[in-house]
Amino acid sequence: MKVDPNKEKALAAVLSQIEKQFGKGSIMKLGEDRTMDVETISTGSLSLDIALGAGGLPMGRIVEIYGPESSGKTTLTLEVIAAAQREGKTCAFIDAEHALDPIYAKKLGVDIDNLLCSQPDTGEQALEICDALTRSGAVDVIVVDSVAALTPKAEIEGEIGDSHMGLAARMMSQAMRKLAGNLKQSNTLLIFINQIRMKIGVMFGSPETTTGGNALKFYASVRLDIRRTGAIKDGDEVVGNETRVKVVKNKIAAPFKQAEFQILYGQGINRTGELVDLGVAHKLVDKAGAWYSYKGEKIGQGRANAGKFLTENPVIASEINTTLRAMLLNGGANSSDSKTESDENIDLETGEVF
């Protein structure tokens, strides 16, 4: 297509002026952007990393993790923090619920001596701390636990029973507008944990909704719905939860996939169990009867023993992990552990299931 040379000259001049005024990279042609390969941080679960499509949660974006009580929301964010710290990144935890257990965090691999932690008095204070940490450019991951606990100052200073219609939603909406650009510039990952509420009078579809208004749904690049699907027992004792995570919104890869994994009490995500399951599903690990073998050598009778073998042999576990990531993240995962949900209606903009 023939382009007017005068227009080309005018465009070059205005682009130069914009870059001089606002900095290099403030405007560019989409196809020329070499920075569009999104940097990610592992969630601690290989199957969830695969379901997300990019290998983890994206840096410079907003992520929302929501679900019922005791479904593993905080555990998942602590696993992300541990993974980020292993890469030498600085992390912060805004504990609005005042419920963070440092002993449990340490068990999950979090370096609590180097984890920044704040227990703010009001929702505005929590979001201002988020913004200040983001603008510093020195913090890589910020977790806010939780949106429901971000109480506006007016509500705290008022009396119980006073009506404060829409205060939290307005506060979140203003914060999202302010934070989104700063997060992109500083390449900081901001994770909001959220709770579920029930909408009154809903006759059709799911009555569930999340707190804090609609702004977070729109600004979030990734929304994860985490649910406990069953209990893991050792004899009569419950030792963990079977967990399912649905990627209900994803702006960095194909959405609507899901991952299933185990969360063991006091240990976190059962990574070796995932490696065994995914290894068998993709023919890296052979299963004959109850026996599991890798490259012709038996590694254990039963899933638990195979997982124990991988725990005791981290080199082999790392080899299986690396091979699975290369297979499934480059070519796309079509296994049952990262399948697309097609039996539900989903709002394509917000990722809301209805």
Curated annotation (Swiss-Prot):
One of its GO terms (molecular function) is single-stranded DNA binding. It is found in: Cytoplasm. ATP binds at G67, P68, E69, S70, S71, G72, K73, T74. GO terms for biological process: DNA recombination; DNA repair; SOS response. The keyword Lipid biosynthesis does not apply. The keyword DNA repair applies. SMART domains: AAA. Residues 343-354 have a biased composition (Acidic residues). Transmembrane segments: none annotated. Keywords: ATP-binding, Cytoplasm, DNA damage, DNA recombination, DNA repair, DNA-binding, Nucleotide-binding, SOS response. Pfam families: RecA, RecA_C. It comes from the Bacteria. Residues 331-354 are annotated as: Disordered. PANTHER family: MITOCHONDRIAL DNA REPAIR PROTEIN RECA HOMOLOG-RELATED, RECA. Can catalyze the hydrolysis of ATP in the presence of single-stranded DNA, the ATP-dependent uptake of single-stranded DNA by duplex DNA, and the ATP-dependent hybridization of homologous single-stranded DNAs. It interacts with LexA causing its activation and leading to its autocatalytic cleavage. Belongs to the RecA family. This is Protein RecA.
